[in-house]
Amino acid sequence: MIYLDNAATTMHKPQVVIDAVCGAMTSFGGPGRGSHQAALDASMAVFGARQAVSDLLDAWGAGSVSFALNATMALNIAIDGLLPAGGVAVTTAASHNSVLRPLNRARDERGCQVRVAAILPDGSLDWESYERALVGASLVVATHASNVTGDVYDIERMAAFARKAGALFVLDAAQTAGAWAFSASGIGADVVCFTGHKSLYGPQDTGGLCVRPGLDIAPLVEGGSGVHSFDERHPRFMPEALEAGTANAHGLAGLAAGCCWLAERGVADVQAHIEGLVTRFLDGVADIDGVQVLGGGSGQRCGIVAVNVGDADSGEIADRLAQGWGVCVRPGAHCAPLMHTALGTQQQGVVRFSFGAMNSQRDCDDALSALRDIACP
């Protein structure tokens, strides 16, 4: 198997992550739910995961990190808790449905206005469209990198424009956390949403949001918190404000291990490794007749390359890659409908190759060989 579907989830995890999860499952009690050793061990693991995430992403400290099931839930928490009824929200056509659908719900149920800044056919942001959309905005929710084409956007500039317009800025870092070197506390964002199961190499059902100190986000879910149990409503102090119920301590032990593994390697070095594979793949694709590369207009690309082979359906190409050569990729719309409208690929979709820290040059070359055999039989 040649696994090149890392943008969906990283399948090959570091052994330290596997060991951490297995160890937690045989020794942890309920985090924040007792004073016996099993409960204390679980509580320390959750705190350790907060610290590991904050250290790796250069956030605002362990207390700024609230956990959720994934980036989708984190984005729902941020949008629901920060966008006032009747407010104006801005996003871009590169956004995933984890942004678009919560915003559309706010439009339909709370009278909010949703403005979408255009993405050009080459995958780059239409800056004039973005600036026009910001007038009177309350909240901006933007993706750091397109999960379709891999285009990486100038988030510092986007956040600066939002701040000038008086809007809060929420960053969807699902595709970049752990794979692209950036400072969560230094890019101008108020909230950075991340997932654990992609480039942080943690288990599925881990993720969360890093919140700027002093920012009050209304809880999306209320319930048991382990503290202030006689209060009628959920605590409003971080990080407990955005968490309810028993934490996934087993998964968070794995997430912490993944973050520590990345810290030892260095995110900048991981990024350089992935960029090298992407460059190698793009160079190879350029020599294959009939293969079109989508996007790239932003000038920076994360570990994602989207292609199409002539007018063939992307699902057919992905099936042939998997069945004939064991190359695992993802076809279709990738839950980002407006990006496909911008690219003109609504019907065909795209074949998405996505590289990670565990991939090698041989993986890249074998995938190119398979693609060449399909395109040029």
How should each PLM-predicted stretch be described?
Residues 1-377:
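Pyridoxal 5′-phosphate
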